[in-house]
Each structure stands twice: as C-alpha cells, then as structure tokens.
Amino acid sequence: MTESIAPQNPEWVVLAEKADQGKDYAMAFKNHKRYKDSKGYFWICQDPDLLNGDEVVVIALQGHVLELKKPEEYNPNWGMFPKEEKFFRLDTMPIMPQKFELTIADGKYMLVQNAKRFLTKAKTVIIATDPDRAGEHIAVALLRFLNVDMTNTKRLWINSLEKGPVRKGFQNLRDASETYPYYLEDFTRSVADWMIGMNLTCLYSQLCWDNGVRTSGALAIGRVLVPTMMLVWQRELEIINFKPEPYYIDTLLCKTDKGEEFVAKRSGEFKDKSAIPVISKLRGNVTDIKTEREAQIPDKLMDLQGLKNRAADELGYKPDETQEAAEELYKKHYLTYPRTSIKVITENEFNYLLDNHSKYKAFFPDANLVRTMPKKTWVDASKAKEHLAIVPTRTIPDLSSLPEKEKNVYLLAVKSVMAMFEDDYYYDKTTIEVENDYTVSGSVDVDLGWKKFYKKGKNTVLSLPSVKVGEELSIKQEIAEYMTKPPKPYNSSTLEKAMENVHQLIDDVTTKKILQGAKGLGTPATRSAIVKKVINHHKLLEEIPVKGKKKLPILQTTAKGKMLAELISKTNKVLGEPKMTAEWEDALSRISKMTLSPKAFLDEINKLVWHAFQTLPTELPKVLKTIDTSALGPAGKSAPVVIGKCPICGTGNILDSSHPKFNAYTCSEETCELRTKSLFKGTLSKWGHKEIKPKEAIELIKGEKIPCKLTFKSKKYDILIFREAATGYIKWEFANPKKK
C-alpha cells in the first residue's frame, strides 16, 4: 500500500487506546477499510449517518505510549553512582524536576509517529480511549506532547463496544473539555507517585545498603503499595499477638410436656460469667410467640469489585483472573465496560435487558420475569453518568465457544441481572420467647424468588416446637463457654475487600468519611494489579497454598516485606497509613472538580519528600539496629551471589540480584558493559515467562538463544529469546517461523 493512501488533512481522527478497540469503532461505520504503510496501521471509514458523512481516520495506540522521564534524563547526577558499592546518589537528591516532562516509552516510537501524522493535521480529533481517568490521561498526554490544538477536540464516552452503542456514541459526542479534568487528576497522581516512588525508594534502599542490609531488589515505596503491604503485616501481628479469651452465652434447655426439645438463648455475649443471672427454677413459661413474613430484595448489580468478590466466593477465582476474564468479555462485546465502581444502570440498559430476558432464560431455565418496571435500587441515571454496573450486552455468546473462566464470569453477570427481574425472597420468621429473656428463632422459605440463583437445595425449614403462649416448659439453664478466635490471614480476595473497606479500620471520623467516599485503597480496576505487583515484582508479599477446593492461597509478608513494614512503622508511619491515601484521594478529587490546583497538591508532596531526606539519614540507622534482618538470607548481609564468570569482560563475575534497585544480573567488574546493560530477571514477565533463571542468564549473556513459551491473547507460542549485544535488551523470534 502506498503512503499516498493516508489522508493528508483528515476531517476527523478517532484515537483509540488499543487495536481491538479501534477495529470496533471502524466496524461501526458502513464503509471501512484497514490500511498499512511504512508508518503503521490506520482505518479509513465513512458513513452517511455519522460525522456529517465525512471521511474518518481511526488510529490505535497500545495503552500508555508516553512515560515520565527517568531521573538521569533531567540531570546525569540524579540516579546512580558509577563506582563503589553505592547505587543511588543521595548527595544530589531528592529528585525534584522544575517541570515534569514526558518521553516516548520503550517500543512505542512507531505508534507515536503513526499517530502524529494524523493528529497534528486533523481538523477534529475524537478522543476514544477507555472511558476512565487512565484513558483520558493516555489521550490528552499524547495530544499535548504532540502540540495538537485541542480547541475543537471531542470525546467519545461509551460503556459498550457493540456496534449500536458505538454508533450512538459518535452521534452524541461530548466536548473534550468536559472530561479534561480527569486528565489533570490522573497526570497529577502519576507525578506524585513518581516523586514518592523515585525518591523514597532510593532513600530507603540506599540507607539500608549503607548500613549493611542488602535486599534482593529495591525496597519499593508507593502511595498504595505500602499501605496494602501494611494491611497484611498488621494482620499477621494481630494473629501472632492474639490471646484467646473466654466468653459466655446464656442458654436454656427447654422441653415441652410432649417431649419436644429446643434451646433458647439470651441475647449477647458475656465476658464475665458472674454477670449472668442465675436461673434456679426447673419450670418456665412461653411468654411470647411472633411469626412475621419478611422480604428481601435482590442484591444490587455488580461493579468490578463486586464481581471479583462473587467469583472468589462461588468459583474460587483470584481477583486478577476474574478481571482478566471480564475484560476479555468486554472486548468480545458480551459485557459492558468492566473497570467500573458503579452498581446501577440507566433505563436504556434496563429496557434492552428486559427485552433479552427470554434469551438469558436459556442459561437459567427456572428464571421468572416479575419485576418489569425500573426501580431506583438498580436503575438510577443520576449515578450512572460516566459508567454503569457490569451487565451483559445485547450480544448473546455461544457459551461453548468461551474459555471456562470467561463463561463462568459471564454467567455471574447474567445471574445478577436475572435476579433483578425476579420477585423478592419471602420467608416466615417465627420467634419463641421463654421467660421474657430467652428466644429461639426459625424461618421457613415461602418463595425463594431471586434467592434460587444463590441458594442451593429445596426450601429450608428450621424445625421449631409446637407451643402456645403461657405453656409451661421444663427448663435448665446452661452457660456455654467459648474462646475467641484469631482473625484469618488475608488471601488475594479478602485483601482486596479490606482495601475497598479500609475505612472500617479507621477511627478518625473525617478520614473514615474520605476513604469511604474514595471507596478505599486503589480502585476496583487497579487493586488486582497492585496486589500482583507487591507479590511478583517487589517481593514484599508471598502466596502460601492452602488445601481445599476453591480455597485461595493465603498472603504473608516476605522477610523483605517484614523489614520494610517495621522500617515504615518506626520511621515514617504516615506512609503506611490509609490516612495519607485518604488525604491524597480527597485532594485529587478536588483537582478533578477544579477546586484545587495540581501545583498546590504537588507542593505538599514536595514537603513530604524533603522531610524524609532531612530526617531518615539520622533515624533509619538507629531503627535498623532494632530490627532482626537475619531472615533476609544471604542477600541480607553478605555479598551478592556469584553464578559464573562474565563472558563479556572475561575478568568479572556475573552477580545474581546484586543491584538494589533492580532484580537483575550484572557484572562485578565496574568497567564491564554488563554493569550499564544489566540483564533484568522479569523482562519477559508480561508474556508469561516469570523470571530468567541463573543458567538462562549465563547462556543469554554468552549470546546464545533460549527456547521459551510466549503467551499472547491467551495463545501460547514457541519462541527463541536472545540478548541484543548492542543494547542489552532481550529480543525474541519465533522458533518455527512460517514460510512465505
């Protein structure tokens, strides 16, 4: 295809976040064709009913194509020492650029160049990245980086990639200025995270290094990362320090004259056994009987966290597995946008879900259609302005074609919708009162309604005796003793629940309110990635397998995590407290509402960082003396592990994880190029290869090719990986390339 095919001054350019998303947009036009030239891919589309019938160019990125510059790109003195056993130049820190600048991320240059030729010449740009803060950040950052005039920029904001909603979205474009504050919020968040992460990670890591404590990889400090780790550490301390205490429950063993027996209980628990009134008599009376019909409405629809919680409880899925499945279902047009914290829909969604009820019934044959009018519990346009709850789209999948996890996650979403259309759950609750203070209750299911989707088995009956008010019973008081139990360790699912409901752990009313409004630590869309990163990348937490079907591994801090948690709690406690996150979230929310300037917020972050640099060099060495670091193993006190002779320089040794900032292989010889072109262990992690092992590292550094499995879009490929000598980067090629 010749380059002349590419429009020189396009009327409209649609900027998508991902290739699949761009394809969905293009396919919504009646006329569409994909092209490729030397600069990349693009679509040319036209439709008499869309965008004035003009010619439209659709281009796609691959997520974030820009990143904040590294410290050394601002100032060569920021960052690392070239000599000695020091890696961070604390004498030139903290790192505080006067202006934060972006650069093109590794591997994204051609994507940016492809986008540039269209975006800079377009009469109107339509931002069509994901409808969230991150999507806004990706697009606006690129437009600003390319100096694109945003005066006439529009925003496509939709919650489904189906053809109908896409077309409707193009017919009802928003002005980009409406969503621009989301960019300000997210960009400011990324700068603040950079300031905290870059500076305090370097500071803590180097001070530990200087004082003889050498961990494998840096001691990562992050706004959400540290409080998340601290939740696990604090739970561990609660379990370790837990001391069982007795408590008592006052019961009456009752027997009718017909021989029917039951146990009635006094409400509450007693710590002091002597505080319980003694019942010495052997006969008592039934003082009251109440039977009430009670109703329970269906649960709310699910946001992403609710979906993850449900999948963990019912299916034993890890949160990240559920999120991945939901995002795949969104790409396939079977679910609405999953990265949401909203639990309601609009009447538009309610109506099409109602129309599709008979189709969904094929998945749940015993479903009934009772509730046909929208109720505010599930349908509330005022709360669904930006996003919706996760619900099925109009497109019905063939379940047999879906992978197991995707099928099950899809059915969870359908089930929540079918429950919304069902009748309430009705049951009769009977309470028998004995001697005024003791009660026993039982319930009989009258109509399971929506509960039938979640309650297994037939209607449950809890047997109660046939008695009357005033009837005399044989009674015997029995005080049962129990022991309190320690809290349970977190797993990935319960940790995310704790992150969501962290306000419940806070006493301060103001902080509690802010955290509740911010919906906890992180967001439903980011929590899984945060937990995964703390485990796999930073090695601060680890998973311990648990026996039992559908039981998730428990989480515990590693030796490295325990040490960092102690350091934080004794030197800079605020970094590990949800309170700091609450204050940040409140400030960022105000930025998105344009009531606080980004500069004012970042000035406060600046003060926090400077305070750490002024106090920690004195405090941290003292604190380290109070911490047992022996559990860190060889990396804790001794020199890095030697795995072999360096084939590059021939004189130095290849060291395993000698670098405190990165989990990498490097050379002991200061002049060796492997010192500046280290081989990072996690280079291939995003393709499913967890970590480069020592034996593999030696072969790669020698210039050999290693067979490996690459995972892309759920498919596995046989590849060969090798180290490019000129750059030190890991490259790959197909092991069995297709012949042309």
Predicted regions and their residues:
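Intrinsically disordered, low-complexity regulatory segments
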Residues: 1-198, 485-486
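Metal- or metallocofactor-binding catalytic centers and their adjacent structured scaffolds
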Residues: 177, 271-302, 308
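Basic, low-complexity terminal or inter-domain segments flanking catalytic cores
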Residues: 2-13, 145, 152, 177, ...
